[in-house]
């Protein structure tokens, strides 16, 4: 059995659903132990999350883009003229706001969960994950702001960081549920072994003064810069600035680092006679607690000791045909030695760690309102940064069908509405419904899709039915 499944950001539209099996483990592994399902097998799925505030596509949505693609023109080429009918117009923002770029995605391989003696959940899973975050990028580095800076007049650039990685995680899940007189208490854990393909980070540690000398050269005062990168594939890339020809060698799929991580969670459910299942549920969890150790084909560079001034001639830098040559040239200019910037052949970076608090209340049979808070934190100097989330998600749910409308506040300032559903063994949704249907400046999107098999009896599809405590064994398999 081979499969994949993609997760776009937090996928709150389906992860609070009691009948999505291992999907619940990614927000709180204790929820799996308290699940009404006897077993859950993921088959296929896909997901993606991307959001940024550097550029945009004018007045469009994903559905509109599907009609107009591939007719695309940039605002620079139009030079103030109206775009041809049926064309998409790309542009960049000219605003004083700091910039950010965020991307995440996951491909899940064989994933299985089953119950033992009703109170114990056991699972195995593999995920291929990718993430990139760049935050607090100074607005002066925006295209228009930078272009409008006068020559020979210095301006300041404040500190910012960026980090990215592609990695595989192989893990096991275990959870157990303790029955009380009026409900249950559950605990769960996902233990993961991570293998990293590509990763790296960049950081400007201190404020620096940047001066445009000409269109081809700049001067930088006190550039306190650090960066790290895996070199297995990037060293196979070369570029000739004269001929504009790029050469890319045969890419390799190798692991350059490893590490362990864990998701830990606990939950409590209170039941009453008014509804099947629980009346309310609360949980707390720690997610992606771990560090990546990159030790093979890895480089960590630093400008320390910080030079008083660094002058870069872009015409000279263009003669470098590989990333390695470019690194050596800048090191020679900044530190007087082409090898001085290379401080180590290994580096560490934190995974997208976060603490999460969840709540869920069943008002009447099958009608719930759930809430989730996710607050990221870092374990290292450089980290893959998760997005802070505050979400409220009303939903209708039974064994065979669910509909959820999450309202999500990201990073405590950007509100979005989502829509998600489950029809038997198919789950689908988005945490950014507006990107699909609302014409506006398009800056990113979010969607997810999954197919699974679990203990549901299809002949009873329309009869609904709620969860009965300690009745896992009576939830039948799919019937065909």
Enumerate the predicted regions with their spans.
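Subset of outer-membrane beta-barrel
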Residues: 9-480
């Amino acid at each position: 059995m081979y499969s994949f499944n993609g997760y776009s950001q937090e996928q709150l539209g389906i992860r609070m659903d009691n009948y999505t099996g291992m999907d619940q483990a990614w927000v709180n592994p204790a929820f799996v132990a308290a699940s009404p399902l006897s077993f859950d097998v993921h088959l296929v799925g896909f997901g993606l999350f991307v959001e940024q505030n550097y550029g945009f596509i004018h007045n469009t949505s994903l559905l509109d883009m599907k009609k107009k693609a591939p007719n695309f023109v940039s605002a620079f080429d139009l030079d103030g003229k109206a775009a041809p009918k049926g064309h998409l117009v790309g542009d960049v923002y000219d605003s004083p706001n700091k910039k950010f770029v965020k991307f995440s995605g996951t491909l899940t391989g064989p994933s299985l969960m089953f119950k033992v003696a009703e109170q114990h959940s056991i699972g195995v899973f593999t995920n291929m994950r990718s993430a990139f975050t760049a935050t607090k990028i100074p607005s002066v580095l925006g295209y228009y702001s930078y272009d409008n800076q006068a020559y020979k007049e210095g301006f300041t650039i404040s500190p910012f960081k960026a980090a990215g990685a592609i990695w595989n995680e192989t893990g096991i899940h275990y959870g157990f549920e303790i029955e009380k007189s009026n409900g249950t208490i559950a605990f769960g854990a996902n233990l993961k072994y991570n293998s990293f393909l590509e990763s790296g980070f960049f950081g400007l540690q201190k404020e620096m003064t940047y001066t445009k000398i000409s269109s081809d050269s700049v001067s930088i005062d006190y550039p306190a810069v650090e960066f790290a990168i895996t070199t297995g594939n990037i060293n196979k890339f070369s570029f000739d600035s004269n001929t504009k020809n790029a050469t890319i060698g045969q890419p390799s799929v190798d692991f350059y680092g490893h590490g362990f991580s864990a998701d830990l969670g606990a939950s409590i459910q209170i039941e009453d006679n008014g509804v099947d299942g629980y009346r309310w549920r609360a949980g707390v969890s720690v997610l992606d607690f771990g560090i990546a150790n990159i030790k093979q084909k890895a480089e960590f560079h630093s400008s320390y000791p910080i030079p008083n001034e660094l002058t870069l001639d872009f015409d000279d830098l263009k003669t470098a045909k590989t990333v390695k040559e470019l690194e050596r040239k800048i090191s020679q200019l900044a530190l007087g030695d082409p090898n001085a910037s290379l401080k180590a052949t290994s580096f560490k970076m934190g995974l997208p760690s976060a603490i999460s608090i969840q709540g869920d209340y069943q008002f009447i049979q099958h009608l719930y309102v759930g809430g989730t808070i996710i607050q990221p934190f870092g374990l290292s100097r450089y980290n893959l940064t998760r997005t802070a989330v505050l979400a409220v998600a009303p939903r209708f749910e039974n064994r065979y069908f669910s509909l959820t409308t999450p309202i999500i506040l990201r990073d405590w300032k950007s509100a979005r509405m989502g829509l998600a559903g489950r029809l038997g063994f198919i789950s689908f949704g988005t945490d950014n419904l507006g990107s699909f249907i609302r014409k506006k400046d398009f800056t990113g999107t979010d969607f997810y899709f999954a197919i699974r098999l679990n203990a549901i009896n299809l002949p009873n599809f329309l009869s609904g039915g709620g969860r009965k405590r300690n009745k896992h064994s009576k939830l039948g398999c799919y019937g065909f």
